Structures are given as structure tokens and as C-alpha cells.
Design a protein with these regions (language model features):
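Alpha/beta-hydrolase active-site loop
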Residues: 1-12
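Alpha/beta-hydrolase fold nucleophile elbow
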Residues: 11-23
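Short coil/turn segments at beta-strand junctions that form active-site/ligand-binding loops
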Residues: 15-16, 39, 93
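Short hydrophobic segments within beta-strands
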Residues: 20, 44, 97-100
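Glycine-rich nucleophile elbow surrounding the catalytic serine of serine-hydrolase chemistry
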Residues: 21-31
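Residue-level signal for short, function-critical loop segments
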Residues: 23, 47, 101-103
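Hydrolase active-site cap/lid region
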Residues: 34-70
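The feature captures the conserved acid-bearing segment of alpha/beta-hydrolase catalytic domains
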Residues: 58-133, 142, 151-159
Length: 160
């Protein structure tokens, strides 16, 4: 991975690395956390199963653009669902999952199915804890942490 090479050339240990993203970027951050073993992940109001995203037309477009058709895409469930990726790569990175309770779409279409599916993950042997951090911010909905809040939290994670 290019990112892993850059981190190593900067003489940074993966254990001292935090990958951060919100929404679809949170999904990608979790996937990168699988590839960068030892790094921590902070994901905010993230998609955990892209195929269950509220904006299904966007998902359809990605599947058609990247895979030509849905049938081909279904051969790679680990590219759309983080639990499937955990199972395929036998690894769960340390994840801090921020969820706004006021984002009903994130809770009903992402968090609840994720928690149900993760219960089926019995054979994954390299497992780090996932901390779900619930907050209640009515006006924000799906919007993530502010830049200041995110930076503060990232430093807290690095200090742990």
C-alpha cells in the first residue's frame, strides 16, 4: 500500500497512526484500518454497509461504473460491508465509531444492522475493540463532528 509506505518512510509506527473519516469516508477509513494493522480508526456517522446506503441511486451508479453490473459486485461483499471485510481479512482494527442519535438513517440503516451482523463474526481471531460513541445533536443529523471536535478527539486517541 502506498499509504503504508509513506507512513513507514516518515518513521511513524502504525500504532501511532489514526485514520479518520466521516460518512463514506468513514467506511474507507475502516477498510484502510484493516490493511494498516495496528492503526486506529475514527469513523463518524459512517456507512458500514454501502449496499444499504440511503442514497441507493448512488450505490447503483458505483456498482455499474466499477463492476459493470450488480452480479459482478456481489462477488465482492467485503468491498461494500465492513463486517464482510473483517471476516475476509480475519482482522478488526481498533475503531472509535461516533454516531449521532439524531440521524435516524444512520441508526436504522447502518448501526443497527452492523451490530446484528457483527454477532455472526465468530471465526475472526485478530479482534480489537470497537467503541461506539453515541451523541445527541438534533441540528446536525448526519453531519459529522466539527473540525475542532474531530481534531481534539484524534489527539485523545493518539494519547491513549
Amino acid at each position: 500500500l502506498i499509504l503504508k509506505t509513506i507512513i513507514q518512510k516518515m518513521n511513524i509506527k502504525l500504532e501511532d497512526t489514526v485514520i479518520y473519516g466521516t460518512s463514506a469516508g468513514g467506511f474507507l477509513s475502516i477498510i484502510m484500518g484493516i490493511y494498516l494493522k495496528g492503526a486506529k480508526v475514527v469513523a463518524d456517522n459512517t456507512q458500514l454497509d454501502v449496499s444499504n446506503w440511503a442514497f441507493i441511486s448512488a450505490v447503483d451508479y458505483v456498482m455499474e461504473y466499477c463492476f459493470d453490473n450488480i452480479g459482478t459486485a456481489l462477488k465482492y461483499p467485503e468491498r461494500f460491508n465492513v463486517v464482510e471485510a473483517f471476516i475476509k481479512y480475519n482482522y478488526v482494527p481498533k475503531i472509535y465509531l461516533h454516531v449521532n442519535l439524531c440521524s435516524k438513517v444512520d441508526n436504522s440503516m447502518q448501526l443497527a444492522p452492523f451490530l446484528e451482523k457483527i454477532e455472526t463474526m465468530k471465526n475472526v481471531t485478530e479482534y480489537n475493540n470497537i467503541e461506539v460513541i453515541l451523541h445527541y445533536e438534533e441540528k446536525k443529523g448526519h453531519d459529522g463532528l466539527s473540525q475542532e471536535e474531530a481534531i481534539k478527539f484524534l489527539y485523545e486517541v493518539l494519547d491513549k
